[in-house]
């Protein structure tokens, strides 16, 4: 957890009561001299924009992802002032159109650029965010920095958007040093392979399946659950090979078993 700093200009005329107050506050970490505060290095974060509701504006057929990363940067200046942030556009899609080719592109960009950053935030549409987070967890196994996906239920330009708070949480997680892939949403952080979207309109859109939250935001700040966080088990070697011939079949009473023969003839693995 990052300490709370209050910058104080030292008075030229010493007041004994004021001096005792400063000494006590310094002892518990609440006050830092302004010169000392300026020496604290900002975490370097990369934001990769892929589109989604968070980057959408009204169009002829409803919301359309059209806002570029520089537009996002303008809207969240109060957040990025606390970090050294670079922005890059790699996609501008409604996430319902995300395909395995896009997963390979996102993973490839992260694999190429991760060594220059303390963490990476990926803005993404909510419809398929859980799918992307899950596949990236395997494609980026043992990545040594936090990769945090986030988005919003309302566009960043909407006056009641949840996007700003979600990005605030995502940046905090990206700066935490915890390795792995995560989803940050509604002040909760979920392991990438455990996230599922359970609500289409509510801000509390994602839940964690069969695992506690990796972190939450409360009155103490970002609180990590160290028992849940991934542990590096070897060197990072990004995986680019994907098999798209995969289908999910939900078994129900009366299901015709010949469907499996049909799938085999269609080259599903």
Roles of regions detected by a PLM:
Residues 17, 23-32, 36-38:
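Short, positively charged and aromatic/hydrophobic N-terminal segments
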Residues 40-112:
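ATP/NTP phosphate-donor binding region
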Residues 51-52, 121, 170, 187:
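Buried hydrophobic positions in well-ordered alpha/beta secondary-structure cores of metabolic enzymes
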Residues 149-219:
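Internal gly/pro-rich beta-alpha loop/helix module
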Residues 43, 48-49, 75-79, 191-269:
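Accessory alpha-helical/coil subdomains and C-terminal extensions
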Residues 117-129, 266-269:
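Short acidic, glycine-rich surface-loop motifs adjacent to enzyme active sites
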Residues 125-145:
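Short Gly/Thr/Asp-enriched flexible loops that form oxyanion-binding sites at enzyme active sites
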């Amino acid at each position: 957890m990052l300490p709370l700093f209050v910058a104080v200009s030292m008075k030229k005329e010493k007041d004994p009561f004021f001096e005792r107050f400063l000494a006590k506050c310094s002892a518990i970490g609440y006050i830092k001299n302004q010169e000392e505060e300026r020496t604290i290095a900002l975490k370097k974060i990369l934001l990769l924009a892929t589109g989604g509701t968070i980057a959408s504006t009204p169009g002829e057929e409803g919301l359309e992802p059209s806002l570029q990363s520089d537009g996002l940067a303008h809207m969240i200046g109060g957040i990025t002032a606390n970090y050294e942030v670079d922005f890059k556009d790699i996609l501008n899609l409604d996430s319902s159109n995300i395909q395995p080719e896009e997963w390979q592109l996102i993973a490839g960009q992260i694999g190429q650029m991760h060594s220059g950053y303390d963490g990476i935030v990926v803005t993404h549409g909510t419809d398929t965010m859980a799918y992307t987070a899950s596949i990236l967890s395997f494609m980026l196994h043992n990545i040594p920095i936090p990769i945090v996906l986030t988005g919003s239920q309302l566009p960043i330009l909407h006056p009641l958007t949840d996007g700003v708070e979600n990005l605030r949480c995502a940046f905090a997680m990206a700066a935490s040093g915890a390795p792995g892939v995560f989803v940050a949403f509604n002040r909760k952080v979920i392991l990438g392979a455990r996230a599922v979207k359970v609500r289409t309109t509510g801000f509390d859109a994602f839940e964690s399946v069969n695992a506690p939250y990796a972190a939450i935001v409360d009155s103490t700040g970002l609180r990590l659950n160290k028992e849940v966080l991934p542990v590096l088990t070897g060197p990072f070697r990004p995986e680019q090979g994907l098999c798209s011939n995969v289908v999910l079949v939900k078994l129900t009473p009366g299901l015709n078993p010949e469907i499996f023969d049909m799938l085999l003839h269609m080259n599903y693995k």
